[in-house]
């Protein structure tokens, strides 16, 4: 990320997003006074119980938003995004591998260890579902720290996890 920008957002809360956090995030983004040229890509599974509700929501937003389902190019979507807002699950490591500055949302108890580690490393900003009203202030901070956060995020992983696991299994 030589020249980090602030125009392409990626939102991914897991395939099912059973608590409709995606829609909550979109509502908070509406209140962030984002530039009109901002583009938001939302990755959701087709089995998400809220996908139609999110489709309706994006029609009323002051910025462009699009839902993508059954994606086979997640790494490409991440590489083409300037920031991500996502659950603090396994995708966190993928965002770090690509040096993608992020706001991570802890949506399950088992994600707190990852969220704490990534936050302390300076690789992402963290909020819980109960703190979504702080998204606007986190976006302001992220915008100011985007280049540094991209660097720290990329430092979290060396991108060769599969090779390391295979060596361990031998």
Model-predicted segments: where are they?
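Nucleotide-activated sugar donor-binding and catalytic core shared by glycosyltransferases
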Residues: 1-170
């Amino acid at each position: 990320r030589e020249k980090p920008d602030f125009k392409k957002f990626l939102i991914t809360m897991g395939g099912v997003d059973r608590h409709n956090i995606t829609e909550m995030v979109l509502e908070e983004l509406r209140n962030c006074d984002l530039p009109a040229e901002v583009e938001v890509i939302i990755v959701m599974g087709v089995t998400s119980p809220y996908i139609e509700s999110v489709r309706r929501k994006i029609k009323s937003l002051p910025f462009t938003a699009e839902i993508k389902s059954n994606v086979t190019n997640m790494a490409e979507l991440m590489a083409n995004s300037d920031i991500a807002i996502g659950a603090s699950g396994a995708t966190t490591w993928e965002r770090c591998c690509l040096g993608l500055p992020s706001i991570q949302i802890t949506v399950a108890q088992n994600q707190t260890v990852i969220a704490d580690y990534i936050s302390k490393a300076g690789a992402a900003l963290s909020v819980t579902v109960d703190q979504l009203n702080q998204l606007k202030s986190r976006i302001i901070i992220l915008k100011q720290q985007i280049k540094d956060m991209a660097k720290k995020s990329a430092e979290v992983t060396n991108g060769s996890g599969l090779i390391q696991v295979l060596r361990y299994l031998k």
